[in-house]
Amino acid sequence: MKCSVHKISDIKKFPESMTVEDILVQSSNIGTVKIAKKIGEKKYKDFLKDLNLFNSPKFELDEIGSPIPFKWNKCKLETISFGHGITTTPLQAAAAYAALINGGMLISPTLEKDKNNNVKFKRIISTETSKKIKKVLRKVVTDEKGTASLADVFGYEVLGKTG
């Protein structure tokens, strides 16, 4: 598969037809590009915005990192779909993944307890979708074809995504 002058490939040969689950569990770059194109650039970009991946995180520390600004140009949809083309801080990545598996709520990370015990959150996906994503991310670690089997630690429910 090509995007402009860049070749997009997989580390190994995959079947022509794969389920979304298999694409994610086995980490097919070509498959994730196809999924992203099916979703469409606008919806994909809006979802990344909902996850707060385009802005500097709001946090109580002055030394908080900022994502490198980028332009949404040719091949950006494709490269972001398989984990390249966008930078995030570890805090942003943790908050985004937490939202995907905690029932769909994006929670603003904080070090300070709110005096009224208010938690700032925003629903970004349905509870049902979150359950499905959690199942797939667990299979990335536990499935024989999963790409993160070394992360499967006895006594812990580890979820993951490589690539």
Q: What do these predicted ranges mean?
A:
Residues 1-163:
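Beta-lactam-recognizing serine transpeptidase/beta-lactamase-like catalytic domain environment
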